[in-house]
A protein has these predicted regions:
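Short Pro/Gly-enriched coil loops immediately N-terminal to beta-strands
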Residues: 32, 43, 51-62, 78, ...
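A local structural motif
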Residues: 13-21, 106-115
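Central regulatory/effector-binding core of bacterial HTH transcription factors
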Residues: 1-46
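C-terminal effector-binding regulatory domain of bacterial HTH transcription factors
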Residues: 15, 144-145, 149, 159-216
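Hydrophobic hinge/microswitch elements
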Residues: 107-154, 159-161, 176
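Beta->alpha turn/N-cap motifs
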Residues: 24, 40-42, 62-64, 137-141
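Secondary-structure junction motif
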Residues: 83-106
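Flexible hinge/capping segments at coil-to-helix
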Residues: 48-55, 62-87
Length: 216
C-alpha cells in the first residue's frame, strides 16, 4: 500500500526524489538525515511536529496449516511451545523480546528469547506464511489481505499487544518548508485513512466485539 501512495504523490510532484528506509531510524532523523519519519507510540519528541496517522492495532497470527499440525494457541503460556517470530527490537543486537499482552482488562508479560528475530516486519510475515511459527504482534494494516484470504488467522484467544497511536513526524524547522509540510500532512492523512479502512475490513471479518478487544 505504501508504494501505491508514494507513486500517487510522485506523479503530482515529479521532480521530488524519495528515499524510503525501514525500520525507522530515530537518531538519524534527529540528526537531520531524514525529513519525515513514521513513528508508533513514541514519547513526545522535542522540537518536532507529530501528526496522528491512525492506530497501530496488533493481531497475533499463524497459518491454518500450522495450527492443524501443532494444535490451538489460546493463551500466552502456549507460546513457550512454539517458535515465535518477532519484529520487536529493543536494540539492534538483542534476541530478547518482552511482550506485554492484554485481554479484557487482564495483562501479562511474556519474555521471548527469539532464536530468529527480524527488524523488518515483512520478513516476520514471510516466515509465518511459510508455516514456520507464529507472530504475536503483526500490525493489522500489514496483514489484512492475508486475513481476508484465509492465509493467516488470529491466535491467542483474544490476548494481544496493546494498540497505540501512530504518527508522521517532522522537525519544527522543517515544518516551515512548504514542500515538507505539504507532504507530511498528505502522508498522515493517507495513512490514517488506510488504517480506518483496515479496521472496517477487520470488523467485517471477525465482528465489532473482536475489534474492540484489540484496541484496548
Amino acid at each position: 500500500f505504501a508504494t501505491k501512495f508514494i507513486l500517487e504523490y510522485a506523479e503530482q510532484f515529479p521532480k521530488l526524489r524519495f528515499n524510503m528506509l525501514s525500520p525507522s531510524d530515530v537518531p538519524s532523523f534527529l540528526e537531520g538525515k531524514a525529513d519525515v519519519i513514521c513513528l508508533s507510540a513514541q514519547a513526545q519528541l522535542s522540537n518536532c511536529i507529530m501528526l496522528p496517522r491512525g492506530r497501530m492495532i496488533f493481531v497475533p497470527v499463524a497459518t491454518p496449516q500450522y495450527l492443524k499440525e501443532h494444535g490451538p494457541i489460546n493463551h500466552p503460556d502456549d507460546l513457550l511451545h512454539h517458535r515465535v517470530f518477532s519484529n520487536l527490537y529493543p536494540n539492534s543486537f538483542s534476541l530478547n523480546s518482552n511482550y506485554q499482552l492484554t485481554k479484557k482488562g487482564q495483562s501479562c508479560s511474556f519474555q521471548a528469547i527469539d532464536t530468529i528475530r527480524y527488524s523488518n516486519v515483512e520478513m516476520t510475515r514471510r516466515s509465518v506464511l511459510e508455516h514456520a511459527g507464529i507472530a504475536p504482534c503483526m500490525p493489522l494494516f500489514f496483514i489484512i489481505d492475508d486475513l481476508e484470504a484465509g492465509r493467516l488467522v488470529p491466535v491467542l484467544g483474544g490476548w494481544h499487544r496493546p494498540s497505540h497511536q501512530n504518527y508522521v513526524v517532522c522537525k519544527d524547522d522543517d515544518w516551515k518548508i512548504r514542500q515538507i509540510r505539504m507532504f507530511s500532512n498528505w502522508w498522515a492523512q493517507k495513512l490514517g485513512d488506510y488504517e480506518k479502512e483496515c479496521e472496517a475490513r477487520l470488523i467485517k471479518l471477525y465482528g465489532r466485539k473482536f475489534f474492540l478487544n484489540l484496541i484496548h
